[in-house]
Amino acid sequence: MMAENNLKMLKIQQCVVANKLPRNRPYVCNICFKHFETPSKLARHYLIHTGQKPFECDVCHKTFRQLVHLERHQLTHSLPFKCSICQRHFKNLKTFVKHQQLHNETYQNNVKQVRRLLEAKQEKSMYGVYNTFTTEERWALHPCSKSDPMYSMKRRKNIHACTICGKMFPSQSKLDRHVLIHTGQRPFKCVLCTKSFRQSTHLKIHQLTHSEERPFQCCFCQKGFKIQSKLLKHKQIHTRNKAFRALLLKKRRTESCPMPNKLNANQGGFENGEIGESEENNPLDVHSIYIVPFQCPKCEKCFESEQILNEHSCFPARGGKIPSRFKRSYNYKTIVKKILAKLKRARTKKLDNFQSEKKVFKKSFLRNYDLISGEQSSEQTQRTFVSSLGKHGTYKTTGNRKKKTLTLPFSWQNMGKNLKGILTTENILSIDNSVNKKDLSICGSSGEEFFNNCEVLQCGFSVPRENIRTRHKICPCDKCEKVFPSISKLKRHYLIHTGQRPFGCNICGKSFRQSAHLKRHEQTHNEKSPYASLCQVEFGNFNNLSNHPDNNVNYNASQQCQAPGVQKYEVSESDQMSGVKAESQDFIPGSTGCLPNVLLESEQSNPFCSYSEHQEKNDVFLYRCSVCAKSFRSPSKLERHYLIHAGQKPFECSVCGKTFRQAPHWKRHQLTHFKERPQGKVVCLRFG
């Protein structure tokens, strides 16, 4: 019945094509305006626009738009057509017929090839072979026996062919292993990583990757390998060497010792000594000789070639001689020139205060310290440091005393830990960049003249490396693995990850992560800028004041009007009665956030001024916190500040329950929950 219906449909289509009758399509889709012949086709077309698929498969629950598509899909679950040769299933009759034709073609081609071979071998004249063989296996492998037609027929019976791809195999086990490729099965599974393999040998090789065992060991250099093929490749390195091959082919003397050859400590290469020949082992057997081809005399490491051994050099011990090829690279003057060039580049790029210069010294100079300078005692270091400073210091007369001012770069103040042993124990610069108990003020300059002196460089940096490696980096961050010198800085860093900004401005409501940032921001709301030097030029930022060209401002600790919190330091030389004074180039803001209460002086202005004038300006801060000693202008700000110590946040959001310390923060947060619609209605985002 199905065949008859198909023939009728074909005849109708042929008649329509031959006569080219015009089709009448009165039914139009009101969405895409397509025309259809029948209402059923129009209804089926509407399913495309609605997205409905009414026909569902019972097995896999797939849906289809037409019944024909469902019937075609159901054939994939049943696969009614089965091949009797390779046991494969097909859902379509056409593909099944094509598949059977392939089997017939391969079978016919194989039969034709076998017949041609038999005819060609039978035509050849066979003569008697009188060769004798020691074993039956060698006789079976002889080519004359293979040319026998009776032998070839027996051989052909034992050939196992694959029914899928037609490949031939000598045994059934190999054929079964080959069939796994077509089926996709991997029966051998690893217990540790659940990887599967087709052969057991592959699984055993894979299991070696999980263990640290190296069963295959090189007999020359005792290096272990997990796979035998890698061991064979490694042995080619030994046999490829000319000196190694010469040793193998050379006649051994029985008088020489059987141990490995001696190594000369004065030479860097391998000394080819004579190796004794054992009575049991064959002298030409490579595996019976224990040879280390190229070995370093100091660290006793083995290398595969002489070139690698020449490139390798052990670091010379302290006080030892430097090789001639390293003398040029570790020249003392070239290192100082490189340091100065990098420092100039760092200044032009305007990097941070001292960290850039410190990194330059750390990477370029201290790396080569062991080759340049040996150990020095602390007394020698102090003498060389004071004598070198005497060449580059400047004298200044103040009253009846003649004082000497050191010209130190500002970055050396922060490297106080490296300057231990240079000054006496009373005058050592502390780690927190402050000075202890003596009149030692610091004035800044470019520092190029100071760095040109090699003695100062050698003395200033001839300290143990432990001071640099273990420089108070104790507290690491568990999120980004950054290291900080103190817990307070780590807590301040955690605010970046949490997103908190606890310090808010009362005027504009901006929030900041640090109190110093808030204080700097509050100066933008003031009418007058607080930071002004003696030239009466106002600045909006503290950094702009420090970069001012006329800013020759010094901390003066020798005046009578001593500001609170400033310490006196003095370093006296044995030759003179004058003290050594170091004056700072830049300001260091105090913990209170305002300008330090120190006396400012300039070389061009009057050095005598009263401290009371500066104190009158700061008398505005009347209300002081009893916990942290911070001062405020009004009691309301002091009360708000006390909330930080108490940990209270009185303003709570009614939507999400978050608490805030200030009302502007709470109002600004509430805007995140509400938004305006175009009609002017305000809708809460949480409750819709």
Swiss-Prot record:
> Which sequence ranges does the entry mark as zinc finger (C2H2-type)?
27-49, 55-77, 81-103, 160-182, 188-210, 216-238, 294-318, 475-497, 503-525, 623-645, 651-673
Q: Its family?
A: Belongs to the krueppel C2H2-type zinc-finger protein family.
- Molecular functions per Gene Ontology: DNA-binding transcription activator activity, RNA polymerase II-specific; RNA polymerase II cis-regulatory region sequence-specific DNA binding; zinc ion binding
Q: Which organism is it from?
A: Pongo abelii (Sumatran orangutan)
Q: Where in the cell is it found?
A: Nucleus
Source organism superkingdom:
Eukaryota
Q: Which InterPro entries match?
A: Znf_C2H2_sf, Znf_C2H2_type
Q: Name one Pfam family in it.
A: zf-C2H2
Q: Where is this cross-link: Glycyl lysine isopeptide (Lys-Gly) (interchain with G-Cter in SUMO2)?
A: K11, K112, K121, K146, K262, K420, K437, K681
Q: Which UniProt keywords apply?
A: DNA-binding, Isopeptide bond, Metal-binding, Nucleus, Repeat, Transcription, Transcription regulation, Ubl conjugation, Zinc, Zinc-finger
Q: Which function does this protein serve?
A: May be involved in transcriptional regulation.
Q: A single GO CC term, please?
A: nucleus
Primary subcellular site in the record, as a coarse category:
nucleus
- UniProt name for this protein: Zinc finger protein 770
